[in-house]
Amino acid sequence: MSLPVKRMGVLGGAFDPPHLAHLALAQAAIAQLKLDELRVLPTGQAWHKTRKLSLAEHRLAMTKLAFADVPKVVVDEREIRREGATYTVDTLRELRAENPGAELFLVLGEDQARVFGTWHEFEAIAQIAIICVAARAILTNDEATSGTQNASSSDPMPNHFHPLKMPNMPVSATLIRARIADHQDILPLVTEPVARYIANYHLFETT
């Protein structure tokens, strides 16, 4: 009798800071894809980010706090520890080698799906993992027209996307950082431990 195939999700991001939409996406992926485990990976040196990220130690700590109570989530530090540019394809290859026979599911948020065609070796990513995207990112094509290459219906890649049903959550790290800079409350957007960490370390403050 053969053992069941392990179903492993992979959710990466800057998590600068992690917020409630990240948690909702993780919980949706675990439930809808019937995952045995979801690896959450804060990025290291993000080649595609024009904005300088917060220190890796802060983003890692906030990510651990944010996902601490989500069953089946494992915060994976490998991209933070990796020297040089961080590429998702390298992480997927490592996970495949470490978990032979496992089925990999790459979980993307709306913003990531829009520019998936610009990712390093995106064709190889699609061969290694099943790409799963928050439904709004692949159903609202008029919103997916920004960027150098997007995930609209004219792009062949969305044919390989598996939709995840997600509530409409107008939350973003950009909005949270702006609220902090404007001395506004962020508790409706992040968990209490993350809000406390941000306050304790005075992250994202402009003055």
What function would you assign to each model-found segment?
Residues 1-207:
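Nucleotidyltransferase catalytic core that binds NTPs
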